[in-house]
C-alpha cells in the first residue's frame, strides 16, 4: 500500500498548526518539489489571512505539498507529518496558537489518500504511541487557497524570528535526526530569496 509509484507528481495537503513550521519541514523532504502555505477546509470561495485568523471561516492553515511518488511515498509524508511536523493529539491548537484554523487535519486528495491516512491513524492509535488520543481529522473535496507571499518560505527567510527559533527550527532538526534518508539540507522554496 506504500510502494513507490512511477515518476510524476502528486499533491498532499496537511494542516497542523501554524503553516510556517509545517511548510518549513516539508521543504526539507527529498522528493518534495513544492510546499506552499495556504488555507483549506472553509466554506467561503476564497481565503486570506485576516479572515482565516478570526477562526470563523472554517479554513485551516495548511500546506499543499507537491511530491514525486517515485522518490517519497504518501505514507512517508504521513510519517513526517505525524512525527515531526505537528502534534496530532492537540485539538484546535498547536503550541502557542489556538483556534480551529490551527487544527490537525489531512485534506485527502482522493479515496486512496483517505484510506492510507485512516489506516495510518488506526495503526498509531492501536500502537498507543502518543500519551493522548490522536485528534487528526480527514476531510475530502476541499479547495486549497495559497497564502499571501509574505507567509511563503517564512521559516527559511526568517530563521532568527523568535517564534521560528522556538517552535519551528526544532521540527526541522527532528526531521534531520529521525529521517536522515528523507532529509534534504537545501529547502525547496516557493519564492526566491530576492523577492
Swiss-Prot record:
The active site is at residue 18. One of its GO terms (biological process) is protein modification process. The keyword Repeat does not apply. Keywords: Oxidoreductase. Transmembrane segments: none annotated. GO terms for molecular function: L-methionine:thioredoxin-disulfide S-oxidoreductase activity; peptide-methionine (S)-S-oxide reductase activity. Its EC number is 1.8.4.11. It is an enzyme of class 1 (oxidoreductase). It catalyses: L-methionyl-[protein] + [thioredoxin]-disulfide + H2O = L-methionyl-(S)-S-oxide-[protein] + [thioredoxin]-dithiol; [thioredoxin]-disulfide + L-methionine + H2O = L-methionine (S)-S-oxide + [thioredoxin]-dithiol. InterPro entries: Met_Sox_Rdtase_MsrA_dom, Met_Sox_Rdtase_MsrA_sf. The keyword Oxidoreductase applies. Has an important function as a repair enzyme for proteins that have been inactivated by oxidation. Catalyzes the reversible oxidation-reduction of methionine sulfoxide in proteins to methionine. Belongs to the MsrA Met sulfoxide reductase family. PANTHER family: PEPTIDE METHIONINE SULFOXIDE REDUCTASE (PTHR43774), PEPTIDE METHIONINE SULFOXIDE REDUCTASE MSRA 2 (PTHR43774:SF1). This is Peptide methionine sulfoxide reductase MsrA 2. The gene is msrA2.
Amino acid at each position: 500500500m506504500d510502494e513507490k509509484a512511477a515518476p510524476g507528481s502528486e499533491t498532499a495537503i496537511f494542516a497542523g498548526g501554524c503553516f510556517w513550521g509545517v511548510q518549513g519541514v516539508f521543504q526539507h523532504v527529498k522528493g518534495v518539489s513544492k510546499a506552499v502555505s495556504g488555507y483549506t477546509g472553509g466554506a467561503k470561495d476564497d481565503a486570506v489571512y485576516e479572515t482565516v485568523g478570526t477562526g470563523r471561516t472554517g479554513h485551516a492553515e495548511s500546506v499543499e505539498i507537491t511530491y514525486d511518488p517515485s522518490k517519497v511515498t504518501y505514507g512517508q509524508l504521513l510519517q513526517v507529518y505525524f512525527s515531526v511536523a505537528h502534534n496530532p493529539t492537540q485539538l484546535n491548537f498547536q503550541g502557542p496558537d489556538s483556534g480551529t484554523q490551527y487544527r490537525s487535519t489531512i485534506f485527502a486528495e482522493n479515496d486512496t489518500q483517505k484510506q492510507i491516512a485512516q489506516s495510518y491513524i488506526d495503526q498509531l492509535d492501536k500502537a498507543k504511541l502518543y500519551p493522548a488520543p490522536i485528534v487528526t481529522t480527514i476531510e475530502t473535496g476541499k479547495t486549497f487557497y495559497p497564502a499571501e507571499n509574505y507567509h511563503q518560505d517564512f521559516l527559511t527567510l526568517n530563521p532568527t524570528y523568535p517564534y521560528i527559533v522556538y517552535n519551528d527550527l526544532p521540527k526541522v532538526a527532528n526531521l534531520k535526526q529521525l529521517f536522515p534518508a528523507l532529509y534534504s539540507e537545501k529547502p525547496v522554496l516557493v519564492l526566491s530569496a530576492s523577492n
